[in-house]
Amino acid sequence: MIEIGRGAISKMSARLDGPTVQYAFRLGDVEVPVNPLIGSTIRLEYLGAIHCTHCGRRTKTSFSQGYCYPCMTKLAQCDLCIMSPERCHFDAGTCRDPAWGEQFCMTDHVVYLANSSGVKVGITRATQLPTRWLDQGASQALPILRVATRQQSGFVEDLFRSQVADKTNWRALLKGDAAAVDLPAIRDSLFESCAQGLQGLQERFGLQAIQTIADVEPIEIRYPVQQYPAKIVSFNLDKDPIAEGTLLGIKGQYLIFDTGVINIRKYTAYQLAVHQ
């Protein structure tokens, strides 16, 4: 086999080329296209080193997908409110890094519906679409609300999760394409059932803070998958440094081999070598 790249891995870059997603490994400063590798035998080799994506310190364990422990405990991007945006404490003056919070949290966010392993509600910065949907493996997606801050979008998501899921079932995601659904109809049903809660949030934060997104059609997304596995088996590079097999496809941040699946994003900051 020939080495085609090595370096600190981060989540694969993903872009739409028509309806189909094009992927590339990001190994340090180098990108290696992945779609052309489908059908080939590929080997990923963990080289035994992890370097924090923020400070570069070598660490035995990756925290919060790519950070050392000291950075995980002090960086705003590793705080609990990243996973639970409704717990944002920027307004309380206790943000770990107010400048970071201004840039990433106190900015427009989009609340969306996506169909990955089924319908889910999610939030992301307005600048992160459609990348967020591609990373999640969504086959359909529809933005439904534009919200002024991350915390406020978290309140909306919390309201909607009583009606729809807010998580993706990764095993179902990798077993096949989700059945198509009518996202506009689901949106309308959500707005109707949660009307009182939405009105309360608009009264609290202002009408301009939470606005519906109208006249937008759902996006349809296709993933480069030749064959889905009958049984889901995950590679674990911490236990076995080699993941090898015939690459059958890519979906979300997962590589699908005939021998197992691997979530590339999980191994952010790991030093890897890729062989073909």
Briefly describe each language-model feature range.
Residues M1-Q276:
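Non-catalytic accessory segments flanking enzymatic or RNA/DNA-binding domains
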